[in-house]
Amino acid sequence: MKKKVLALGAAITLVAPLQSVAFAHENDGGQRFGVIPRWSAEDKHKEGVNSHLWIVNRAIDIMSRNTTLVKQDRVALLNEWRTELENGIYAADYENPYYDNSTFASHFYDPDNGKTYIPYAKQAKETGAKYFKLAGESYKNKDMKQAFFYLGLSLHYLGDVNQPMHAANFTNLSYPQGFHSKYENFVDTIKDNYKVTDGNGYWNWKGTNPEDWIHGAAVVAKQDYAGIVNDNTKDWFVRAAVSQEYADKWRAEVTPMTGKRLMDAQRVTAGYIQLWFDTYGNR
């Protein structure tokens, strides 16, 4: 869920510059925050600083535990082509056309209006489904490297809409500015507390169309939005600029719903991967 956030190009000229501020809960000796925050060294192959990869890996773990519904040769293929899968997950945030010239417009999708935050831009539902299908075409053509790269891309967009801010078009420039990125940094610090430990993915959850799965995930995520972004958490986040107490308060407030979202994301992702294999079959 971690988001590399929103340089909006010319649109940023319409937004007042952000004041540089060291948040009370940051322990890096005074990290400064601007429109594009300085992220920790996110690594395409290290899930500790890559929540998208963490969710996909936990989903594969779920699949590996379910020897009744999941053919284990599918898990073997995911592991065989893990590097390509991880490259796709990572590229979505760092390469064009996937990150939309640093606007990340295609990483958002509001299920109520079917749009991202930029008018007429591609959104996560259509983009995630596009790469799901391209992955399938490559798979059928036995181009496994390209297939699993595209699958990684698709899984990234699915992962985004499981994050309530992405399902409500709440960007890093939404008020309070910077909340989106600081929240996603926080998620990295607690995610290991919410690992699914069983083999129960959301199998056959939303039919056979990837669009329906991405839409369904966004619907559920947006329902949980108020548990993360609300008047209290916004106020406490602003106060956290000078107060450790308020930094602790907003983090504590968002933790229960964040845990729920992380667990749902793992189960949905397991089912989505299973759908892909069901759709395009084994070699």
UniProtKB/Swiss-Prot annotation:
Pfam family, one: Zn_dep_PLPC
Family annotation (InterPro entries): PLipase_C/P1_nuclease_dom_sf, PLPC/GPLD1, Zn_PLipaseC
Residues at which Zn(2+) 2 binds: H166, H180, E184
Residue numbers binding Zn(2+) 1: D93, H107, H156, D160
Details of cofactor binding: Binds 3 Zn(2+) ions per subunit.
Domain Zn-dependent PLC: 39-283
Catalysed reaction equations from the record: a 1,2-diacyl-sn-glycero-3-phosphocholine + H2O = phosphocholine + a 1,2-diacyl-sn-glycerol + H(+)
Keywords: Cytolysis, Hemolysis, Hydrolase, Metal-binding, Signal, Zinc, Zymogen
Annotated GO MF terms: phosphatidylcholine phospholipase C activity; zinc ion binding
Residues annotated for Zn(2+) 3 binding in this entry: W39, H52, D160
Entry's Gene Ontology BP terms: killing of cells of another organism
Cofactor: Zn(2+)
EC code(s) of this entry: 3.1.4.3
Signal peptide start and end residues: 1-24
Propeptide, chain numbering: 25-38
Assembly description: Monomer.
Similarity-based family: Belongs to the bacterial zinc-metallophospholipase C family.
Role, per record: Required, with sphingomyelinase, to effect target cell lysis (hemolysis).
Protein name, UniProt field: Phospholipase C
Organism, scientific name: Bacillus cereus
Gene name tied to this protein: cerA
